[in-house]
Amino acid sequence: MPQPTRTDPALIRNFCIIAHIDHGKSTLADRMLQLTGVVEERQMRAQYLDRMDIERERGITIKSQAVRLPFTALDDVTYILNLIDTPGHVDFSYEVSRSLAACEGAILLVDAAQGIEAQTLANLYMALEHDLTIIPVLNKIDLPAAQPEKYAAELAGIIGCEPSDVLRVSAKTGEGVEELLNEIVARIPPPVGNADGPARALIFDSVYDTYRGVVTYVRVVDGQITNRERIQMMSTGATHEMLEVGVISPEPTKVDSLGVGEVGYLITGVKDVRQSRVGDTITSAAAPAAEVLPGYRDPKPMVFSGLYPIDGTDYPVLRDALEKLQLNDAALVFEPETSAALGFGFRCGFLGLLHLEITRDRLEREFDLALISTAPNVVYRVRMEDGTEHTVTNPSEFPSGKIAEIREPVVKATVLTPSDYVGPIMELCQGRRGVLDGMEYLSEDRVEMRYTLPLAEIVFDFFDQLKSRTKGYASLDYEPSGEQAADLVKVDILLQGQVVDAFSAIVHRDNAYSYGAEMTKKLRELIPRQQFEVPIQAAIGSRVIARENIRALRKDVLAKCYGGDISRKRKLLEKQKEGKKRMKMVGRVEVPQEAFISALSTESSGEGKDGKKK
């Protein structure tokens, strides 16, 4: 078997699998591991490459992995196939683009019973932009509901090949997998690079290991990377000593060096993944390369949410937990904030809703924390009339005074749906201030619709609405596309004239009344009755737009006046009224924790279900 150091690039094939969740990507990877014999039968477990429990449980891949598979093809030559596993979710599209940049080809894996989905389509377009060779494959042909002929024609139409070029496999039974491996060798071009030039390697993932610090996964483009040499990160200029170089097959195996086209891992003893960023170029510190590999960018958070421990004493635990998660997740940002209502917590920035959902899940599961998260927010840019600019990630930072313009982020969304549901989807998108950019029929019963939508309208419960209006058949993909000016206002919720910061929200002027009315009504049901009347108001600035009252609890002061005189009764009632008035002046409304939790969770219920969304 060719050694990693001395493998002829002509024998290497780097490929990834593009697939929607549940279309069988991990199962296909499992079959490949078994067929090439790198995992013994007795060590095999389902979803071998998905390491995190949450990945196995939700059936999604969050971090990329890379496995080296030796495969003897029909011509009796042993080729090295590097399978680079990619995340399939829209929040992680930058990670996907870096994984694709490390490959020369991609397997487009589609469920033969369901057809292609919006995210798969988005990742396919990304693969075509990277000039990858696409091998279309229909999986699950053993299912009784499979319609391979129909979907082969659909795939052929999208990629521009013949329906007969579409391979058919069943990852579950293993049928057609060997033929697929032979096709990979035949169709995907070998990597090209300058073996004698300065070393350049692309980082496509980095993982934090408790014992050894950060493990960085790389694909060598030019030159070679040798153990024990000093390397330099080209985006930051930082240099590190290399402690170990290796390949994964599928357990880490040490080697002396990695040559052109090889995929492997490096360990430098760095303790923080933010120093080894996905998409960065690694070069030798002694003879650095001049050109950076294209496509690197810093991950920017799109959605912000406050995370607060339900038990205030857990604050330091939450801080440590976030720092630990950040070791493995360079896109997560957080800063401490306090809220009069919820106490101490953190304002966290995420790539999208699934990222938020998964981070919250991991905090609760791995660190045993009970958390409240405030409604997700996007980043607004507010320009005042005096020319100053504010960046707002939290409604409480919203400036008061004369505002010239507010700009909000927008996304280009693609919805794939059966053609019967075009009406309800248009209605939903227009209700969310969407603008239709165009629509295309992929086949007679499937439509691709393209919309420009404000990100703020998607982060709430857009996905749930989309699924419920299309009986779960539509799929959504979106990518950021700049910002637009919008007529937005901040709605405050006041309890007895005091603003409760946790419930403030920035909404479009047209939706302000419905948000205010809904929140006041909800709080009226959740806050227990006090000894005095409590007004709940929703206000924009100083203008109240909705109000509900919590009626006072009253003691029956007339119980002991049996027949008695009316003036006696009136005296007692007046006295009670006087007492209530005094109470109202000095009384404070205690909002129970449960009321916060249920008001915030119903308000951001979009998130709760959204994690399972795809």
Curated annotation (Swiss-Prot):
This enzyme's EC code(s): 3.6.5.n1
Membrane topology category: Peripheral membrane protein
Source organism superkingdom: Bacteria
Main location: membrane
Domain tr-type G residue range list: 10-192
Record's keyword annotation contains RNA-binding: no
Alphabetical UniProt keywords: Cell membrane, GTP-binding, Hydrolase, Membrane, Nucleotide-binding, Protein biosynthesis
Gene Ontology molecular function: any one: GTP binding
Pfam families found in the cross-reference section: EFG_C (PF00679), GTP_EFTU (PF00009), GTP_EFTU_D2 (PF03144), LepA_C (PF06421)
One GO term of the biological process aspect: positive regulation of translation
Function: Required for accurate and efficient protein synthesis under certain stress conditions. May act as a fidelity factor of the translation reaction, by catalyzing a one-codon backward translocation of tRNAs on improperly translocated ribosomes. Back-translocation proceeds from a post-translocation (POST) complex to a pre-translocation (PRE) complex, thus giving elongation factor G a second chance to translocate the tRNAs correctly. Binds to ribosomes in a GTP-dependent manner.
Protein's name according to its UniProt entry: Elongation factor 4
Organism (species): Thermobifida fusca (strain YX)
